[in-house]
């Protein structure tokens, strides 16, 4: 063989050898630079109420904002004894201390250390005599601190000195009800509490008192309690108590495979001397996905089992990679390569740890590419790993080829997961330029993940002034200061960062309403039709809707009502439901609804969430895949975390002065808004309560059966000849020992709300719109009159209510107080646009 022939062969061999060496070295380096998440290390705290374990608390490694950490409430009796238990899981505990504060966190009530406690078999027991500093039946913040070496771990709760024996009976009953759900032979226990069967009989994912007793007792499923029930007291008040019970249920399916379910029971109970009343009972069950079980159907669908109807899932453009979130875990199913990858999970492969399974986080899938790489966001409480015990938002990239996860940013938060979810879950987006957008504290932020720089893109957003597309790619807003008088809407494409404007003439005002997919819906109103009543409430009657193609700003469809005006819309899929109003005697009132359709649903959709019926499980969910088939075999993988050599923390400075209202229902925050009226409606529908930013109750169902009409209600002398709006405001101020000329202030352009805010600085003024007369009696039960519009320029005060369905109405024109039924009052208030003003002491 000649030298010319040998030389190329040698070069090829050298190249191949070098390539192999490079690959081995690279793979070894990648292996060394990846790791699994560190195990959970933090202790768990709980309390004993008449020998029943309640109120399990999980630890935080940073001090949180205590006013945003409203969870369970610990009852203590007059003896002020508190029995505490801590599962240390091997952590050395050097010191345990606690602080008691007022609910707004401003006043320190007690600061003490637990001087004596036993520590045996990784369990600490302590009996504490709480200081005699708490007012009875008043909630306080309670913060425990466990010190281990140089590290502190914090635990947050509420505490109330109340009738501990009564609370114990409530807990005992809830536990008894829970135990009975596993007894199929004797169903007599439930007959007293069940309601008429009007609920869905074909589901075990959600059951309540309108379900069948068979559903309550798990039907034909061989349900078994796998973990001990975690019982929590969420609310204690004069009207009812709220208890939740969380546990893991196990069941062996027809194939002999064991399945696990996270189950929550919610009780709203009222206790009397004779019996316990179950006002509400609901149970939800969601299967914990296990890729080691059979989960691909014969048609290729991904079987998710019993779960809620709302699911987070996404596919790449080709439909070859399916990603989905189930009970806090992110999975990726690679169809072409026959792989199922557990991308992210706090749960270990073996067993169910109470710390790892504490499901106080959410995952949002941002994008999936053709290689199976995923951008996703994890927000909430971090159960283990680098950020164990922190609450925050983590931005992650999963490499579909290397099967590794890189943390690109972590944004810590001082609020609970529930509050974070209610506020930040509204807006999350990551584009291809590595720019991450999120909404917090009424502002839209952009974080450049390359430079870690932060920019506030839009600030001062308020309810009704903005909306986002379903994918969060498009964000539309008007200036909040000109929310009802803007002829320009800005629409930002977060993918490109570019903004375009929708603009009309000065005689037309615009309002962003929503999106159908990525198509933008906005309304327009004649400037002359937008009016404010004497109390300052603005009505925005829209004469038409426009649906805009965001890709080229072309108008796809316009809608003009055949009669009346558009008040608001709601979007469900490709259907827009339109609420219509018309003017009657100077006041706008609802006249019905209309619907329009935009584009047809995409018939070429690659995946969809479907349901089917099972003999034992009833309704089960699955992700159906177009053209799918069952693979011959499936490879199981678990992604590894990349070890970061740089700090990924992004510290956003939030405005603590922003006022928000939080709806707590069924043991969780279910809604957050700057609009008190929206919060009341949500709380009323969910049998919940409304809390403000200072942990103050600003609405609940009335705590008193009756309140006598307030005495000393009268306007001052300077306003006695004014109209009823002025005199009603004047009477509210006089009731609070404030004397000013309301006539002059309103004549100078101030609204009723402005006058009250400026002259009652120690009160939180609440401007209520669209609520009913039954909704306002809570404020009267707190000793506060309620201003109510009865026409465009007329008003009265509601000053009391009876136990037989009547309100006491103060008429400022004649100074008389008369009774009126709720029905008659609602008709009168309807003529005023259901507009009320009241206040709470700050």
Per-segment meaning from a language model:
Residues 240-278, 282, 810-818:
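Exposed beta-sheet edge and beta->alpha loop/turn motif
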Residues 140, 235-250, 372-378, 520-525, ...:
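A short hydrophobic beta-strand element
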Residues 335-338, 400-401, 448-452, 493-497, ...:
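Short loop/turn segments that connect beta-strands within beta-propeller blades
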Residues 708-842:
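Conserved active-site-adjacent core of cysteine acyl-enzyme catalytic domains
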Residues 110-113, 281, 340-349, 405-413, ...:
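Beta-propeller fold detector
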Residues 35-99, 104-108, 139-220, 296-339, ...:
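Core segments of small alpha/beta cavity-forming domains
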Residues 25-31, 67-83, 94-119, 127-141, ...:
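Surface-exposed, charged secondary-structure patches
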Residues 1-16, 25:
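N-terminal Sec-pathway targeting helices
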